[in-house]
A protein has these predicted regions:
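Eukaryotic RNA-binding helical-repeat scaffolds
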Residues: 1-249
Length: 249
Protein backbone atom coordinates (compact mmCIF):
# COMPACT_ATOMS: atom_id res chain seq x y z
CA UNK A 1 0.00 0.00 0.00
CA UNK A 2 2.87 2.36 0.81
CA UNK A 3 4.42 1.59 -2.56
CA UNK A 4 1.20 2.33 -4.41
CA UNK A 5 0.83 5.67 -2.67
CA UNK A 6 4.47 6.76 -3.02
CA UNK A 7 4.97 5.75 -6.65
CA UNK A 8 6.84 3.11 -8.73
CA UNK A 9 10.26 3.62 -7.12
CA UNK A 10 8.93 3.20 -3.60
CA UNK A 11 6.81 0.28 -4.76
CA UNK A 12 9.95 -1.54 -5.94
CA UNK A 13 11.57 -0.91 -2.54
CA UNK A 14 8.51 -2.22 -0.74
CA UNK A 15 8.43 -5.34 -2.92
CA UNK A 16 12.12 -5.96 -2.24
CA UNK A 17 11.61 -5.70 1.53
CA UNK A 18 8.56 -7.93 1.25
CA UNK A 19 10.54 -10.55 -0.67
CA UNK A 20 13.23 -10.56 2.03
CA UNK A 21 10.64 -10.91 4.78
CA UNK A 22 8.96 -13.78 2.95
CA UNK A 23 12.30 -15.56 2.51
CA UNK A 24 13.02 -15.16 6.23
CA UNK A 25 9.54 -16.40 7.12
CA UNK A 26 9.99 -19.56 5.06
CA UNK A 27 12.74 -20.64 7.46
CA UNK A 28 10.56 -20.33 10.57
CA UNK A 29 9.74 -23.40 12.61
CA UNK A 30 5.98 -23.15 12.66
CA UNK A 31 5.76 -25.46 15.66
CA UNK A 32 7.57 -22.81 17.71
CA UNK A 33 5.34 -19.92 16.66
CA UNK A 34 2.55 -18.66 18.87
CA UNK A 35 -0.96 -19.36 17.63
CA UNK A 36 -1.82 -15.67 17.41
CA UNK A 37 1.29 -15.02 15.29
CA UNK A 38 0.26 -17.71 12.81
CA UNK A 39 -3.11 -15.98 12.46
CA UNK A 40 -1.42 -12.59 12.07
CA UNK A 41 0.78 -13.86 9.24
CA UNK A 42 -2.25 -15.24 7.40
CA UNK A 43 -4.06 -11.92 7.87
CA UNK A 44 -0.98 -10.00 6.69
CA UNK A 45 -0.66 -12.04 3.48
CA UNK A 46 -4.29 -11.25 2.76
CA UNK A 47 -3.95 -7.53 3.44
CA UNK A 48 -0.95 -7.53 1.09
CA UNK A 49 -3.00 -9.48 -1.48
CA UNK A 50 -0.08 -11.86 -1.60
CA UNK A 51 0.12 -15.65 -1.47
CA UNK A 52 3.69 -16.78 -0.64
CA UNK A 53 5.41 -19.07 -3.13
CA UNK A 54 5.71 -22.72 -2.25
CA UNK A 55 3.55 -24.20 0.48
CA UNK A 56 4.13 -21.64 3.24
CA UNK A 57 0.51 -20.45 3.37
CA UNK A 58 -0.75 -24.03 3.35
CA UNK A 59 1.70 -25.03 6.09
CA UNK A 60 0.63 -22.11 8.26
CA UNK A 61 -3.04 -22.96 7.78
CA UNK A 62 -2.36 -26.64 8.54
CA UNK A 63 -0.55 -25.70 11.75
CA UNK A 64 -3.28 -23.27 12.81
CA UNK A 65 -5.93 -25.91 12.11
CA UNK A 66 -4.17 -28.39 14.40
CA UNK A 67 -3.79 -25.75 17.13
CA UNK A 68 -7.51 -24.94 17.00
CA UNK A 69 -8.43 -28.62 17.18
CA UNK A 70 -6.19 -29.05 20.22
CA UNK A 71 -7.70 -25.95 21.83
CA UNK A 72 -11.23 -27.16 21.14
CA UNK A 73 -10.57 -30.55 22.73
CA UNK A 74 -8.62 -29.20 25.74
CA UNK A 75 -10.32 -29.23 29.14
CA UNK A 76 -9.00 -25.76 30.07
CA UNK A 77 -8.33 -22.51 28.21
CA UNK A 78 -4.73 -21.62 27.40
CA UNK A 79 -2.92 -18.30 26.96
CA UNK A 80 -1.97 -19.59 23.50
CA UNK A 81 -5.61 -19.89 22.41
CA UNK A 82 -6.78 -17.71 19.53
CA UNK A 83 -9.03 -14.77 20.46
CA UNK A 84 -11.86 -13.32 18.38
CA UNK A 85 -9.57 -10.84 16.59
CA UNK A 86 -7.19 -13.64 15.61
CA UNK A 87 -9.96 -15.85 14.24
CA UNK A 88 -11.50 -12.97 12.30
CA UNK A 89 -8.13 -11.84 10.97
CA UNK A 90 -7.19 -15.29 9.69
CA UNK A 91 -10.54 -15.72 7.92
CA UNK A 92 -10.25 -12.23 6.43
CA UNK A 93 -6.68 -12.93 5.33
CA UNK A 94 -7.64 -16.12 3.52
CA UNK A 95 -10.51 -14.36 1.75
CA UNK A 96 -8.37 -11.42 0.61
CA UNK A 97 -5.60 -13.74 -0.58
CA UNK A 98 -8.13 -16.01 -2.28
CA UNK A 99 -6.75 -18.98 -0.35
CA UNK A 100 -9.44 -21.51 0.62
CA UNK A 101 -8.15 -23.95 3.24
CA UNK A 102 -11.09 -26.29 3.85
CA UNK A 103 -9.73 -27.81 7.06
CA UNK A 104 -9.03 -24.49 8.78
CA UNK A 105 -12.32 -22.97 7.66
CA UNK A 106 -14.21 -26.02 8.92
CA UNK A 107 -12.67 -26.02 12.41
CA UNK A 108 -13.26 -22.27 12.69
CA UNK A 109 -16.91 -22.73 11.80
CA UNK A 110 -17.16 -25.42 14.47
CA UNK A 111 -15.40 -23.22 17.04
CA UNK A 112 -17.06 -19.83 16.56
CA UNK A 113 -20.76 -20.57 17.36
CA UNK A 114 -20.07 -21.29 21.04
CA UNK A 115 -18.02 -18.09 21.34
CA UNK A 116 -20.11 -15.57 19.40
CA UNK A 117 -20.54 -13.21 22.35
CA UNK A 118 -16.76 -12.71 22.31
CA UNK A 119 -16.97 -11.21 18.81
CA UNK A 120 -17.72 -7.57 18.07
CA UNK A 121 -20.30 -6.57 15.47
CA UNK A 122 -17.44 -5.57 13.17
CA UNK A 123 -15.81 -8.99 13.50
CA UNK A 124 -19.09 -10.79 12.86
CA UNK A 125 -19.82 -8.85 9.67
CA UNK A 126 -16.22 -9.29 8.45
CA UNK A 127 -16.38 -13.04 9.00
CA UNK A 128 -19.67 -13.37 7.14
CA UNK A 129 -18.43 -11.37 4.17
CA UNK A 130 -15.11 -13.23 4.13
CA UNK A 131 -16.91 -16.57 3.93
CA UNK A 132 -19.02 -15.15 1.11
CA UNK A 133 -15.88 -14.06 -0.79
CA UNK A 134 -14.49 -17.57 -0.38
CA UNK A 135 -17.84 -19.11 -1.37
CA UNK A 136 -17.60 -21.21 1.78
CA UNK A 137 -21.05 -22.21 3.03
CA UNK A 138 -21.04 -23.98 6.41
CA UNK A 139 -24.67 -24.63 7.32
CA UNK A 140 -24.30 -24.99 11.11
CA UNK A 141 -22.18 -21.85 11.34
CA UNK A 142 -24.67 -19.82 9.30
CA UNK A 143 -27.59 -21.13 11.36
CA UNK A 144 -25.80 -20.00 14.53
CA UNK A 145 -25.04 -16.60 13.02
CA UNK A 146 -28.63 -16.17 11.88
CA UNK A 147 -29.91 -16.93 15.37
CA UNK A 148 -27.35 -14.69 17.10
CA UNK A 149 -27.21 -11.49 15.06
CA UNK A 150 -30.85 -10.30 15.55
CA UNK A 151 -30.24 -10.01 19.30
CA UNK A 152 -27.31 -7.64 18.75
CA UNK A 153 -28.39 -5.44 15.85
CA UNK A 154 -28.27 -2.29 17.99
CA UNK A 155 -24.50 -2.80 18.21
CA UNK A 156 -24.12 -2.96 14.41
CA UNK A 157 -23.40 0.08 12.28
CA UNK A 158 -25.46 0.59 9.14
CA UNK A 159 -22.52 -0.61 7.04
CA UNK A 160 -22.12 -3.76 9.15
CA UNK A 161 -25.82 -4.60 8.78
CA UNK A 162 -25.65 -4.07 5.02
CA UNK A 163 -22.49 -6.18 4.74
CA UNK A 164 -24.04 -9.02 6.74
CA UNK A 165 -27.27 -9.07 4.71
CA UNK A 166 -25.34 -8.92 1.44
CA UNK A 167 -23.08 -11.77 2.58
CA UNK A 168 -26.11 -13.93 3.40
CA UNK A 169 -27.37 -13.36 -0.13
CA UNK A 170 -24.00 -14.20 -1.68
CA UNK A 171 -24.02 -17.41 0.36
CA UNK A 172 -27.62 -18.05 -0.79
CA UNK A 173 -28.63 -18.59 2.84
CA UNK A 174 -32.21 -17.53 3.59
CA UNK A 175 -32.40 -17.52 7.40
CA UNK A 176 -35.91 -16.40 8.39
CA UNK A 177 -35.07 -15.28 11.94
CA UNK A 178 -32.09 -13.27 10.71
CA UNK A 179 -34.01 -11.59 7.89
CA UNK A 180 -37.06 -10.88 10.07
CA UNK A 181 -34.86 -9.38 12.78
CA UNK A 182 -33.06 -7.17 10.28
CA UNK A 183 -36.26 -5.97 8.60
CA UNK A 184 -37.93 -5.27 11.96
CA UNK A 185 -34.90 -3.27 13.04
CA UNK A 186 -34.14 -1.29 9.89
CA UNK A 187 -36.99 1.24 9.42
CA UNK A 188 -35.85 3.57 12.21
CA UNK A 189 -32.21 3.35 11.10
CA UNK A 190 -32.56 3.93 7.36
CA UNK A 191 -31.25 7.54 7.61
CA UNK A 192 -27.92 6.10 8.85
CA UNK A 193 -27.34 4.22 5.58
CA UNK A 194 -25.34 5.74 2.75
CA UNK A 195 -26.83 5.15 -0.69
CA UNK A 196 -24.50 2.24 -1.47
CA UNK A 197 -25.40 0.39 1.73
CA UNK A 198 -29.07 1.17 1.17
CA UNK A 199 -29.02 -0.20 -2.38
CA UNK A 200 -27.01 -3.30 -1.44
CA UNK A 201 -29.37 -4.13 1.42
CA UNK A 202 -32.50 -3.69 -0.70
CA UNK A 203 -30.95 -5.68 -3.55
CA UNK A 204 -29.94 -8.57 -1.27
CA UNK A 205 -33.36 -8.77 0.41
CA UNK A 206 -35.01 -8.77 -2.99
CA UNK A 207 -32.73 -11.52 -4.28
CA UNK A 208 -33.48 -13.57 -1.16
CA UNK A 209 -37.18 -13.03 -1.94
CA UNK A 210 -37.95 -12.01 1.62
CA UNK A 211 -41.33 -10.37 2.07
CA UNK A 212 -41.66 -7.86 4.92
CA UNK A 213 -44.36 -5.24 4.39
CA UNK A 214 -43.28 -2.90 7.19
CA UNK A 215 -39.73 -2.68 5.88
CA UNK A 216 -40.79 -2.32 2.25
CA UNK A 217 -43.20 0.50 3.13
CA UNK A 218 -40.56 2.28 5.22
CA UNK A 219 -37.95 1.89 2.48
CA UNK A 220 -40.34 3.25 -0.17
CA UNK A 221 -41.02 6.35 1.91
CA UNK A 222 -37.36 6.83 2.76
CA UNK A 223 -36.13 6.48 -0.83
CA UNK A 224 -38.35 9.40 -1.85
CA UNK A 225 -36.30 11.61 0.49
CA UNK A 226 -32.96 10.33 -0.87
CA UNK A 227 -33.53 10.71 -4.62
CA UNK A 228 -30.97 13.50 -4.87
CA UNK A 229 -28.28 11.38 -3.19
CA UNK A 230 -29.17 8.34 -5.28
CA UNK A 231 -29.09 10.37 -8.48
CA UNK A 232 -25.69 11.81 -7.58
CA UNK A 233 -24.28 8.28 -7.33
CA UNK A 234 -26.22 7.14 -10.44
CA UNK A 235 -28.08 4.54 -8.37
CA UNK A 236 -31.72 5.58 -8.87
CA UNK A 237 -32.45 2.83 -11.40
CA UNK A 238 -30.85 0.14 -9.22
CA UNK A 239 -32.89 1.18 -6.19
CA UNK A 240 -36.13 1.34 -8.17
CA UNK A 241 -35.57 -2.18 -9.50
CA UNK A 242 -34.93 -3.49 -5.99
CA UNK A 243 -38.01 -1.69 -4.65
CA UNK A 244 -40.12 -3.12 -7.44
CA UNK A 245 -38.89 -6.62 -6.57
CA UNK A 246 -39.68 -6.17 -2.85
CA UNK A 247 -43.13 -4.71 -3.57
CA UNK A 248 -44.02 -7.61 -5.87
CA UNK A 249 -43.31 -10.31 -3.28
Amino acid sequence: RLGKVAGPAAQRDVQEVLSQLIEATSNFRLSEMRTRDLARFIEAWGLLRHTPKGRLMERMCNTLEQRLKFSRDASEASSNDLNSAGITGAILGMSLAGFKHEGLLSIMCETVPDRLFEFSSSEISKMLYSFARLEYRHRQYLLAMGDHVPHRLKEFTAQEISTSVYAMWLLKFRHRKFLTGVCDHLPERLPEFNVHSLCNTAYALGKLEFKHRKFTAALSTHVASRVKDLNKEKMVANMLRSLQTLQSL
